[in-house]
Structures are given as C-alpha cells and as structure tokens.
Amino acid sequence: MKKLFGLLVCLFLLSSCDDGDLVVESFNFDDVSIQKCPDKDPLFKINGQELLLLDIPSSFFPNEITPDGQPRIATVSSENRIIYRKYDAKLNDNSVICSTVPPATPLVQQEWNAVEGGTIEITTTQNTITDPDTGEVTITGYNHRIKFINVEFVNGQTSFAYEDYFFGDYITAP
C-alpha cells in the first residue's frame, strides 16, 4: 500500500511540474534610454534580450510646450501601439527594429501587446541654456516625457497591467 501511495505521489508531482515557459508579469526598462530609428516613427528601449516598443506617429511630439497639468493624450489603439518582446538572444543593436528586412536572429520568444484603451501621456518642456555673459536663453531641444496610464499587456490567456509606468524622456531638436 505504501508503494502504491508513493507511486501516486510521484505521478502527481511529475504531472504538476512547470513546463519551463517564461511567464512575464512585469518588466524594467528604468535605466535604459529611448532610441529611435532615423527614418521610422517607433520609439523603443532595449534591455538585454528584451524590447519595449512604442509605435506612435511623430505628430504626437511637436516642439511645443504642453501647459502644466495638460499633457498630450494618445489612446492605445491599432495606430498607437505598445509592444513588449522577449528574444532568444541579446539584442546588440537596433537592427531588429530599424532594418528594412529584419535579421534572421535573434528570434522573438514572446510578444505581449497592449490592449486598446490604455493612455499614453506626453508632457513637453523646453531644454534651454543661458549665456552667462549676455543672459541670452537658447533653446537646445524639447523633452517629451512619456508615461503609460492603465495599460494592460496580453499574450494569449495571460495578462499583466501597469497603472502608471514611466516609459522615458524623448528629446527632439529645436
């Protein structure tokens, strides 16, 4: 009887083992700068084998200051997409995103897409320098602070969400 019970316990443990698939419940791109391809709209961050991509028209980044408390708002949709990808190898450069024909490797292991309805907030300020001798102020660029509000990512039946996620600062020339 003890042997039968032991066999049943072993079978149960073997059948309940994890299959090894990676389950993403969050990501961290805090220490990574935003990048952009020279001739394409998407903004993205690369962190090792991970990619976080914001595909939004450049018209959301005019060189105009947003009033205090009134950021530009874009709703996550088929035109304003946020995508998280996990690759099978480290991304050494931006060729995965910027190439007309993407390289054969690395391969996407998982892709999580933000569902429609979340919010992308963009607050724009001027970057300036002041000449110490003349006091003349020169605009050196515009800083676009990007936040995701109530954004949910899905992959099949699994999802995770961010109530408030700071994507980063994207700087444009004056």
Identify the residue ranges that each predicted region occupies.
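A general structural signal for short secondary-structure junctions and capping/turn motifs
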Residues: 2, 35-36, 136-137
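Sec-dependent signal peptide recognition
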Residues: 2-8
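Bacterial Sec-dependent N-terminal signal peptides
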Residues: 11-39, 174
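Generic structural motif
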Residues: 20, 49, 59, 125-129, ...
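Surface-exposed helix/loop patches within compact recognition domains
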Residues: 41, 45-138
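Flexible beta-edge/linker motif
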Residues: 140-142
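Edge beta-strand at a domain terminus
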Residues: 144-174
